Regions:
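Conserved NTP-binding/hydrolysis module of P-loop NTPases
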Residues: 11-12, 71, 81-100
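Walker A/P-loop nucleotide-binding motif
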Residues: 43-61
């Protein structure tokens, strides 16, 4: 059965290459509002939901609204890397020279985040998709990696996006459930 004809659709909205399509709903507006707030205040954000709920679509839409002269967006979905490979990849994506040793990668990542935020006056936005697969070693390191001036400054936005199991990994409770169609999404 051709559902495009049956439902009077002009195209198949479920294709992966249909990224220019965005259906604005109350829930999507709320997600975008909260992501905008995260961009303004900096720090860590978390976006979780069941597969197909529109996490990547919302992030893509949000990134399109960010001013390139004010934000440098780094997107990675390589959350299954070893910690050192993850940091080498992050250093490279930020535009820094990656190193072999973890402490060296920490240093260059922090230097690049500081350079971007202080010298270039750009807020680094680091988006880690599929973060539910990220190792606890990397998550534990984030507290150290994003500690600036004795934990008195936020130099970047870090958005972790993934399945609801990420909440359990982080041991967080859901503070605001934006939308659910059934109890299975809780």
């Amino acid at each position: 059965m051709d559902y495009t004809i049956r439902y009077g659709l002009e195209f198949n909205p479920f294709l992966k290459n249909s990224k220019e399509i965005f259906v604005s709903t109350d829930e999507s507006k709320e997600v975008l509002f909260r992501l905008d707030y995260l961009a303004k205040t900096k720090g860590f954000g978390l976006l979780t939901g069941s597969p197909g709920r529109g996490k990547a679509t919302a992030i893509r839409k949000w990134v399109q609204t960010l001013n390139n002269s004010q934000y440098k967006v780094v997107y990675t979905c390589f959350s299954t890397f070893s910690p050192n490979d993850f940091y080498r990849n992050l250093a490279t994506e930020l535009g820094a020279q990656a190193h072999y040793r973890k402490p060296d990668n920490f240093r260059v990542i922090q230097e690049e985040l500081t350079r971007l935020s202080v010298e270039k006056r750009k807020t680094p936005v680091i988006i880690i998709d599929e973060a539910n697969y990220i190792s606890s070693a990397i998550l534990n390191d984030f507290k150290l990696l994003f500690n600036f001036e004795m934990d008195s400054r936020d130099r970047a936005v870090v958005l972790l996006s993934g399945l609801p199991s990420l909440n359990a990994t982080l041991r967080l409770s859901v503070h605001c459930l934006l939308y659910t169609s059934d109890a299975a999404d809780d």
